[in-house]
Amino acid sequence: MPLVLYNTLTRTKDVFEPLVPGHVGMYVCGPTVYDRAHIGNARPVIVFDVLYRLLKTLYPSVRYVRNITDVDDKINARAKESGEPISAITERTTAMFHEDIGALNCLLPDVEPRATAHITQMIAMIERLIAKGFAYAAEGHVLFAVGAMADYGALSRRSSDEMIAGARVEVAPYKKDPGDFVLWKPSSDDLPGWDSPWGRGRPGWHIECSAMSLQHLGETFDIHGGGQDLVFPHHENEIAQSTCANGKPFARFWLHNGWLMVEGEKMSKSLGNFFTVRDLLDQAPGEAIRLAMLTTHYHQPFDWTADGLKQAKATLDRLYTALRGVADIDANGYEGEAPLEVLAALKDDLNTPLAISHLHELAGALNKATGLEDKARRKGALLASGHLLGLLYQDPEAWFKGTGAADGPSDAEIEAAITARAEARKSRNFAEADRIRQDLAARGVVLEDGAGGTTWKRG
């Protein structure tokens, strides 16, 4: 089965074939680093991490580029508000972003360019746009002239009036058309700025990604991804800048993940339902957060709920229980490739819900397996499938023991309680043994008695 992806540009599911056989180039818009990533930021990171893993399985060479936006008015505002230097803000929040997405089992991209390291490339692209008649300088600004591009709006398919409303354009006397957007803007002495032919200034948001993708993937590449909120104006304007400056097609496939809500409502600080990734990591394992987000198809809106997170953790409990039962069996010879049905699900426009349903089936088959080779083969199939989704990398015991609540018992306390319970049972003091079990249960620890002794997990 070929890889099929929903292409926002064509509004259809198209068969994907790399521009250069065997080599895939993918660009995904990364974070603006001024604060901790929220759960809406996490969804595209997880979605495109799964796509990256799939592409690496299917093709010998994949180059994944995800940028860091470290020059932006939001960063400037945060620096003014806090008094902290901009460089300190961007370094600190970039490190926090890496820490948080690492906890979600997301691989690092092959290249992670910073906007501030590509100012020269941005200026060069703007100069080409001016020379070709697609941009003009006015009062220290440089603007893209949307009227000069015949098919501007092809990605979002909006009318000019809709585009002006959707972009919340700034009405300015120096604009030739209300829809013209900023490529370069002047900087006062208290703001970051770079020397340019138009005076000291800084780039607009859209030109940053056009310049960085050109530098690291070339004029035309395979896949450009991001959240649905970026279709317009950001991705529309990237297409305009890149195709007009380079005279060649830009990205061939455009993939966008759907909106994120929280308990059926738009996430908002005013509604009290705004969560950072770190907020959730303080409550639940990153693997459970990741699985919860993959239970809905990436192209659809996703409703984050406490119940959904609980169900994701229960699913991982079942999967790790199956692996715990064969912990002593070596599956190294069988972990190469996920079963065909799992690959088929993901090759059908990243159908992660279907792939997850196959994980349940694989775990069930593993539980019923007999014989060492059968168990090794089925264990390998489950692990390979989980790894393709960024799941099941932990030792089962580590998963069940987890981190626990801040006020919960330590591992040493739990082991001591299990030893005391075993002694109570040995002396037939069953009331004391039951009391210990109930005390641990009340503190979030579940004991499981088996032929090999007592194991435990945090509930």
From Swiss-Prot:
Which cofactors must be present for this protein to function? Zn(2+)
Give the catalytic activity: tRNA(Cys) + L-cysteine + ATP = L-cysteinyl-tRNA(Cys) + AMP + diphosphate
Picking any one GO molecular function of the record gives: cysteine-tRNA ligase activity
What InterPro entries does the annotation carry? Cys-tRNA-ligase, Cys-tRNA-synt_Ia_DALR, Cys-tRNA/MSH_ligase, CysS_C, Rossmann-like_a/b/a_fold, tRNA-synt_1_cat_dom, tRNAsynth_Ia_anticodon-bd
Which leading EC class covers this enzyme? ligase
Disulfide pattern: none
Q: Which domain of life is it from?
A: Bacteria
Q: Which GO terms describe its biological process?
A: cysteinyl-tRNA aminoacylation
Q: Where is this motif: 'KMSKS' region?
A: 266-270
Q: Where in the cell is it found?
A: Cytoplasm
Q: Which residues bind Zn(2+)?
A: C29, C209, H234, E238
Q: Which CDD domains does the record match to this protein?
A: Anticodon_Ia_Cys, CysRS_core
Q: Does the keyword Amino-acid biosynthesis apply?
A: no
Recorded GO cellular component terms are:
cytosol
Q: What is its EC number?
A: 6.1.1.16
Its keywords, alphabetically, are: Aminoacyl-tRNA synthetase, ATP-binding, Cytoplasm, Ligase, Metal-binding, Nucleotide-binding, Protein biosynthesis, Zinc
Mainly localized where?
Answer: cytoplasm
The UniProt annotation puts motif 'HIGH' region at: 31-41
Q: What is the protein's quaternary organization?
A: Monomer.
The UniProt similarity line reads: Belongs to the class-I aminoacyl-tRNA synthetase family.
The protein here is known as: Cysteine--tRNA ligase
User: Per UniProt, what is the name of the gene that codes for the protein in this document?
Assistant: cysS
